[in-house]
Amino acid sequence: MKIALGIEYNGQNYYGWQRQEKVRSVQEELEKALSHIANEKIEIFCAGRTDSGVSGTGQVVHFETNAVRPEKAWAFGTNAHLPDDIAVSWAKQVDDEFHARFSATARRYRYILYCNKLRSAILAGGITHCHLDLDAEKMHQAGQCLLGEQDFSSFRAAQCQSHTPWRNVHHLNVSRIGKYIIVDIQANAFVHHMVRNIVGSLIEVGTGNQPIEWMQWLLEQKNRQLAAPTAKPDGLYLVDVIYPQKFDIPKRPIGPLFLEDGLLNRPLK
């Protein structure tokens, strides 16, 4: 049978999602826990492989197994064997045609900035600290030129292995809650470091170092060296993966934590 799981994880203590030799990964920890519950070796496939330090509240994985367990056993049982910074949020038996990566039609990320002169110890690792205040409205306006299907070479990491820089951005919204700036972006897929590179350049607009029109210019240049430095991984979260309705994949409130849609100044699409 094929099982899908919703996964939440704090990426601070991991070298990314993907299993690697001699370093901790989210995939390895999850496969070990699932293999214990299934009494057989389990290999998982995820919707999106996040980088070192990046967290997830809406990751989706699937695996195949000969073991027959109630759905709640896959959730509660697996959680009992996971470290505290990884958790299963739901479990569901799915059709054989479902694939966590290839069945997905879109991925959604949120990047959290904390604008304050002094950094926070409690929030360390979960947000990116910015000692300057940012103009969220200008950042939002600047980001609208990125909507639609376009060449994102200017926001693509040099080591990106994708065959094409073209991606289709469905929405990009920038909102503020007090001292927090939230960049919310959804696309069919993302090139390597795309969200963090976009955020790094939006910060330049938010501080007033660059005009709103600069983002359009960057996009047209198709040159990564002209854009701003990559934003830190600390504030980035994979918050949702979108699938066709026929798979009936469970939905959870978009987070992380207190950052639900209804609390943001700008309604999210």
From Swiss-Prot:
Q: Report the enzyme's class at the first EC level.
A: isomerase
GO molecular function per UniProt: pseudouridine synthase activity; RNA binding; tRNA pseudouridine(38-40) synthase activity
Enzyme Commission number, as recorded: 5.4.99.12
**Binding sites annotated in the UniProt record for substrate:** Y109
Instruction: Return any one Pfam family short name.
Output: PseudoU_synth_1
The record's SUPFAM superfamilies line, in alphabetical order, gives: Pseudouridine synthase
Can you name this protein?
tRNA pseudouridine synthase A
Organism, by scientific name, is Haemophilus influenzae (strain ATCC 51907 / DSM 11121 / KW20 / Rd)
Phylogenetic classification of the source organism: Bacteria, Pseudomonadati, Pseudomonadota, Gammaproteobacteria, Pasteurellales
Q: Which gene encodes it?
A: truA
